[in-house]
Amino acid sequence: MSLLVVGLSHRSAPVSVLERASLNADAQLKLLQDTVAAEPAAEAAVLATCNRIELYADVDKFHAGVAELSTLLAQHSGVGLEELTPYLYVHYEDRAVHHLFSVACGLDSMVVGEGQILGQIKDSLARAQDLHTAGRLLNDLFQQALRVGKRAHSETGIDRAGQSLVTFGLEQLSAGADVEQWARGKKALVIGAGSMSSLAAATLARAGVAEIVVANRTFERAERLALLLEEQYGQRLSEGDDTDVLARAVPMDAVPGELTRADVAVSCTGATGLVLTADSVAATVEGRTGAPAVEDTAVQETAVREAGETPLPGAGSAADENCPLDLSSVSSVPSGFSVMGEAAVAGMDAATLEQHGAWAAGGTAVDRTREAGRSGPEADAELIGALAATATRVGRIPERRRPEPVAEAPRPQPVLFLLDLAMPRDVDAAVHRLAGVRLVDIESLADASADAPMAADVDMVRRIVADEVAAFGAAQRAAHITPTVVALRSMAADVVAGEIARLEGRLPGLDDKHRAEITQTVKRVVDKLLHAPTVRVKQLAAEPGGAGYADALRTLFDLDQETVASVSRAENSTEKNRGPA
């Protein structure tokens, strides 16, 4: 077995690189064709999702295979090899098997335990089978990966450790609130009609949204999805809603208008450019207001007093009414900081800050100095003395300290919630900075998932993966010696046929009954002699390090290498010509 995988994923590369390296359907087909046309690779399959691009191949040379597969990935992704290489990972033989089985179980997903990857692996295998780039090794590998993934989900609680990317994204949008409560009654827009968009629409329907609008470049696909939603969730969607059309389809050019009505939008189109720019989103939320995010000032001051703290005077407040310092130049700054516990606004220089602090603590001498309008060395000396007296009275000496941050003015509550599940992104990242909009995209999901708790069932799945990798390796090593065993039995059959022919020459009067009996007896003797050695050699070959037994068998019986190779090629050709399961 010479299985090699070269790839990159959300674990090895930043989203900015994954976006640029994404492969559309045509690029995947061309990549497969070019891979099997390359010298080191005999089979190939590509697994491309939102969060990973992996090229699997059966190669005869490791280093040449790594170089060729890396070059092909760079060539077809459009990202230069020099830039792409630091983010690539390589797995070989049993490690490659372990990697794919872990991926199939959801252990390597952004949301641990999500089951959508199984469908993507199945599609990957079907694509390779359609192009006849998957032979015996990759057929066995991917089909076993699907079985391992299903076993993990059925025998453990891995589903409780994770969820679909859609559900996780909605949880991030709801900011920790119950998703069903948060979604109930909202109007939803789903952009795209592929598998991820369909899953998003179904998840929103189950969560209890009031209306779902589906937009897609191919209007017929949008209509089909809307019809399915009506059939499956129409009754639930109609609860508490008096509209006649609860799930409907619109063309892509209707998206800007629909976005002005939507409360939540999910986009996953696979487009190469942006579907929603920051300007277009800003235009849709202009004039829409949500619940205020800032509590009333009186409520805040009450909370401060209840906490046992002294409210800090700020620029423009009533507390500044008699302050001798001119704070008008800095009163418009929305954020501030405090020094020595005294309030100040951003924009004060150090001297002004200390004078304001002294006045706030009752520095009447400062007031008198300012009111007198005096200046010069004597006035400065008097001012310094007043500040020193104030410091003595309040029990501390003024000191320079690093400003302590004060929270900026809170953003208004969102009126539009956007979930971008596309790679490359559908929604401009600049939307994160728009007031009134909450955007969750692949990058923010990656950050959030890094802190997600892991379920105990994950350990059980890891044990399943380890056991399945060992079993698969044993089966492959045993299968590797099969062509040699077949060639040995073929040689034995030729020997039997030759000896029977020679016997007929010596005994021309032998009747058919006796000839058949003699032939059968000789065959039984040969089969019995070969049975124990061939069974045992398969067992030995299945063990780690058993690859050498095939060579030993060929040497012992002087088997023709080309005969063995022809048997192997015939088996592989049969697998490649086998259509999707």
From Swiss-Prot:
The reply to whether Nucleotide-binding figures as a keyword in the UniProt entry is: no
- Which pathway is it part of? Porphyrin-containing compound metabolism; protoporphyrin-IX biosynthesis; 5-aminolevulinate from L-glutamyl-tRNA(Glu): step 1/2
Q: What is its EC number?
A: 1.2.1.70
Q: What does UniProt list as catalytic?
A: 50 (nucleophile)
Record flagged with keyword Oxidoreductase: yes
Q: Which residues does the annotation say bind substrate? A: 49-52, 109, 114-116, 120
Gene Ontology BP annotations: protoporphyrinogen IX biosynthetic process from glutamate
PROSITE patterns, alphabetically?
GLUTR
- Ligand binding (NADP(+)): 192-197
Gene Ontology molecular function terms on file: glutamyl-tRNA reductase activity; NADP binding
Q: List, alphabetically, the Pfam families matched.
A: GlutR_dimer, GlutR_N, Shikimate_DH
Q: Keywords for this entry? A: NADP, Oxidoreductase, Porphyrin biosynthesis
Insert as annotated region, ranges: 292-416
**Superkingdom field:** Bacteria
Name the enzyme group at the top EC level.
oxidoreductase
- The site feature described as Important for activity is recorded at 99
What is catalyzed by this enzyme?
(S)-4-amino-5-oxopentanoate + tRNA(Glu) + NADP(+) = L-glutamyl-tRNA(Glu) + NADPH + H(+)
Q: What does this protein do?
A: Catalyzes the NADPH-dependent reduction of glutamyl-tRNA(Glu) to glutamate 1-semialdehyde (GSA).
Q: Which NCBIfam families has this protein been placed in?
A: hemA, PRK00045.1-3
Q: What's the entry's take on its domains?
A: Possesses an unusual extended V-shaped dimeric structure with each monomer consisting of three distinct domains arranged along a curved 'spinal' alpha-helix. The N-terminal catalytic domain specifically recognizes the glutamate moiety of the substrate. The second domain is the NADPH-binding domain, and the third C-terminal domain is responsible for dimerization.
Q: Which family does it belong to?
A: Belongs to the glutamyl-tRNA reductase family.
Q: How does it assemble?
A: Homodimer.
What more the UniProt record tells us is:
During catalysis, the active site Cys acts as a nucleophile attacking the alpha-carbonyl group of tRNA-bound glutamate with the formation of a thioester intermediate between enzyme and glutamate, and the concomitant release of tRNA(Glu). The thioester intermediate is finally reduced by direct hydride transfer from NADPH, to form the product GSA.
Protein name, UniProt field: Glutamyl-tRNA reductase
- Which organism was this protein described from? Streptomyces coelicolor (strain ATCC BAA-471 / A3(2) / M145)
Lineage of the source organism? Bacteria, Bacillati, Actinomycetota, Actinomycetes, Kitasatosporales
Q: Which gene encodes it?
A: hemA
